[in-house]
Amino acid sequence: RYFEWQEKRCYRSAKKIVVVTDSFKRTLTSRGIDPAKIVVVKNGVNKALFTPRPKDEALKAQLGLAGKTVIGYIGTHGMAHKLDFILQSAKKLEDNPNLHFLLIGGGAMKESLLKLKDELGCTNVTMLDSVMKEKVARYISILDVCLINLKKSPLFTTVIPSKIFENAGMGIPILMGVEGEAKDIISQYGAGLCFEPENFDDFKQKLTALLEPATYAKCKEGCRHLADNFDRKLLAANMLKVIESAK
């Protein structure tokens, strides 16, 4: 209770409060904070690093993925990310030999996920350790679809995964199992398709639809528009205006 009081005291004494989602602004407003002092500056993409480039065919061949349609997840393998659902879904899609799932990263659930992959006998999944930040773009380049997934929970309707912006910056259509504000962004820009978290039938349907050439092309264009509107240079300029207005 004391720390909550201190938190509210800081909010009320601040000239400006910067939050990274509209949901956070609504939460603070519901707690009695003046909405006029709350500014939303969302995360974005470093377009100097994450920009469209040709697929790294050498890397793709090195990983044994030549000729495959690669569905990729690059990021933390934690409890929130529900990657066991992805492995189980991949197993059910083994009858499509062209599809291959690439999971890159580490985290609290990595070992149990590796064990689950072996138990399921997945032949269409490759799991790699984390790569250096400066090499991430190289791995994103070999993806045909960026996979973003979170556990089905009201808690995650307020978050916006940063993977959205990096993959959109590189023009990789997004298949996302996250509800709420993140889903709204994907839908607004047409940068991909969203499935109900932890629903395999919807996952399969949306993946199939996303890979249709016409839909895929539209989503690539949607990625471009999304990245243009979430360019970090623009967001930094907005942030600077907020700081200057608070002087």
Named regions from a protein language model:
Residues 98-105, 110-138:
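Nucleotide-activated donor-binding/catalytic signature segment of Leloir-type glycosyltransferases, i.e.
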Residues 23, 44:
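Carbohydrate-associated surface elements
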Residues 65-90, 102, 220:
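Conserved donor-binding/catalytic core segment of Leloir-type glycosyltransferases
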Residues 81, 132-139, 144-168, 175-184:
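Nucleotide-sugar-dependent
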Residues 1, 51-64, 220:
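A short helix/loop element that forms part of the nucleotide-sugar donor recognition site in Leloir-type
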Residues 1-17:
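Membrane-proximal helix-turn-helix segments that form the acceptor-binding/catalytic region
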Residues 202, 215-229:
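A short, well-ordered alpha-helix in the C-terminal region of glycosyltransferases
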